[in-house]
Amino acid sequence: LSVVALVLVGRWLNATKVGGQQPTEPFRIAGNFYYVGTNDVAAFLITGPEGHVLLDGGYPSTALMFMASIAKLGFDTKDVKVLLNSEPHPDHGGGLAVLQRASGAQLWASEASADSLASGGDDPDIILPLRGLIWSGILGYPPARVDHRFKDGDTIRVGPIALTAHVTGGHTRGCTSWSFPVRDGDRLLNVVSACDLGVLATSTYPEQAADRERSIRVLRGLPADIWVTCHARWWGRYRKFVASTTAKNPVDPFIDPEGYRAYLDAAEAELRSGRTH
């Protein structure tokens, strides 16, 4: 376990210094739906006349990057009224407290993720060596104030914005995917933001494989014209963004139901093989 922990810490520190912390150009995906994350750690802004929703918090040190991206698009972080989260690991929950202080937004969390977010990343399902690193502050992050806890199937609203929560456990117990409509011109597009479907096997979460299988089934049942995930490389952020800069309609490269099905097929094949990532 100590070897695994060291490998994971190395990956985390590498992501912190390189992959997860490089700012990238923010852009509109479709309608009122924007990408404001880094080159790989994703964050999304959904804008509305009564306030905005920000999905995911990144690492503690990416929060300022997210806010800079929001400003570059012409919006104000102080107009973010709701913060949402996919899962409480440091690369997605670590910056929520910083964003919360900057915006004054209310944080909604799944019942199974709330305590971890409020504790700065502690989770009884994390293997003990990694929990020790969280307790020591090496892998921990500033605790977030959880204002509301939601259940599977709840809908979070800010004016005309409505996002439905789908608790898709496996990566963590409270891992949450989101579905919501986006109006782009005369098209009403279905968007799915899928939570991580990979697992880090742990003896304290014996339902992990069953939850992962259920999550894939749930996600297959969600119509997705546009799909994204909490890591940009999985849904082809860069490729789709580049294609959008020359497309007749810049939204078209992001419409990818075939890619969504392929992503779920790959996750199911990984599950059947017993592999994790």
Label every model-predicted segment.
Residues 2-4, 10, 253-277:
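C-terminal regulatory/interaction regions
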Residues 22-73, 77, 177-199:
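Conserved beta-strand hairpin/beta-sheet module of binuclear metal-dependent hydrolase folds
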Residues 31-35, 58, 83-86, 203-208:
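Short, flexible loop segments at the rims of nucleotide/cofactor-binding pockets, characterized by
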Residues 17-22, 57-61, 119-129, 199-208:
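Acidic/histidine-rich helix-loop elements
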